């Protein structure tokens, strides 16, 4: 079926789906421009306003609208002159597409704003760096200029006279003393310091630690470093007495540190036998057993 018979038969009243007109390049370009304008990528031409207001839009299969209607809507495009190959690729629509796409591309705008924010932050850091260095230098100067300020003591300790060059210090019951106090006569008893529930009392060359109960069982007596027995070595650990609490063995009469004997100050036994004496007794028993066993074998 040729194009003349198809054009003659292409009327709304006498339309049959079997008769179709061949579409040309101009028809395809017109259709594409209409679709782009309908999607909002390019502005509508002035002649196309009645087409857009029509209730039934153009079909993508291109079978319901006559070519005469397209020519009336787009009279500026010459139908007799074929479009070049470059027009088929829609190169003439690229500038308008770019102009319409630039405002809607928010990703590029975000990248630009992020770069600007980073630049501002760098400028702020560079401007704040010399100020911080000057502030640190000022703090160092103030620390070097300020004298050492001692912490104020309690009113009960301020009334106690102390030696200016060699202040008194309280000893821990298990650690050797590092300082010495001014000598006091044996008859005088002076309260030196109060630490929580424990009171440190000095009696001549002895320092007594008393709890709140002030019972004799809770006292820890320590000897001052001025005593001759301070550097005396009696314990098997080969360390001096050094004011630490010790206990005497009932067998060999040697003084042993409570920490070396693994005895707590709150649980000191009345009778103590050191480990060496225990081992010697055990060896004697073993030797006696071996002797009696050998005698029995010899007699048998």
UniProtKB/Swiss-Prot annotation:
Keywords: Cell cycle, Cell division, Chromatin regulator, DNA condensation, Metal-binding, Mitosis, Nucleus, Zinc, Zinc-finger
Biased composition (Polar residues): 172-185
Expression triggers: Expression levels are tightly regulated during the cell cycle. Strongly up-regulated during late G2 phase and M phase of the mitotic cell cycle. Down-regulated at the G1-S phase transition of the cell cycle.
Post-translational modifications reported in the UniProt record: Subject to proteasomal degradation. Stable when bound to chromatin. The soluble form is rapidly degraded.
Subunit structure comment from the entry: Interacts with histone H3 that is trimethylated at 'Lys-4' (H3K4me3). Interacts with GSK3B. Interacts with TRIM28. Interacts with SETDB1; the interaction probably enhances SETDB1 chromatin-associated levels and activity.
Gene Ontology MF terms in the entry: chromatin binding; chromatin-protein adaptor activity; histone H3K9me2/3 reader activity; methylated histone binding; zinc ion binding
Protein's UniProt name: PHD finger protein 13
Family annotation (CDD domains): PHD_PHF13 (cd15632)
Gene Ontology BP annotations: cell division; chromosome segregation; DNA damage response; mitotic cell cycle; mitotic chromosome condensation
Zinc finger residue extent: PHD-type: 232-280
Lineage: Eukaryota, Metazoa, Chordata, Craniata, Vertebrata
């Amino acid at each position: 079926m040729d194009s003349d018979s198809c054009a003659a038969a292409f009327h709304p009243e006498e339309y049959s789906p079997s008769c179709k007109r061949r579409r040309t390049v101009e028809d395809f370009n017109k259709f594409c421009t209409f679709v782009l304008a309908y999607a909002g990528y390019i502005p509508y031409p002035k002649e196309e306003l009645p087409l857009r207001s029509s209730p039934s839009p153009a079909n993508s299969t291109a079978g319901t609208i006559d070519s005469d209607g397209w020519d009336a809507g787009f009279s500026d495009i010459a139908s007799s002159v074929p479009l070049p190959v470059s027009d088929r690729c829609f190169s003439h629509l690229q500038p308008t597409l770019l102009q319409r796409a630039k405002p809607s591309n928010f990703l590029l705008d975000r990248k630009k704003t992020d770069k600007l924010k980073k630049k501002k932050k760098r400028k702020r850091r560079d401007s704040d760096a010399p100020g911080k260095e000057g502030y640190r230098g000022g703090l160092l100067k103030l620390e070097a200029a300020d004298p050492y300020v001692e912490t104020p003591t309690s009113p009960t300790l301020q009334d106690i006279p102390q030696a200016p060059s060699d202040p008194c210090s309280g000893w821990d019951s298990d650690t050797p003393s590092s300082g010495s106090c001014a000598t006091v006569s044996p008859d005088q008893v002076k309260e030196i310091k109060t630490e929580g529930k424990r009171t440190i009392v000095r009696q001549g060359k002895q320092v007594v630690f008393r709890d709140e109960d002030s019972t004799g069982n809770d006292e820890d007596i320590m000897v001052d470093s001025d005593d001759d027995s301070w550097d005396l070595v009696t314990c098997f650990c080969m360390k001096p007495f050094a004011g630490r609490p010790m206990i005497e063995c009932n067998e060999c009469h040697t003084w042993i540190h409570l920490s070396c004997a693994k005895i707590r100050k709150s649980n000191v036994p009345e009778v103590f036998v050191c480990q060496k004496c225990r081992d010697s007794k055990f060896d004697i028993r073993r030797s006696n057993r071996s002797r009696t066993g050998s005698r029995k074998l010899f007699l048998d």
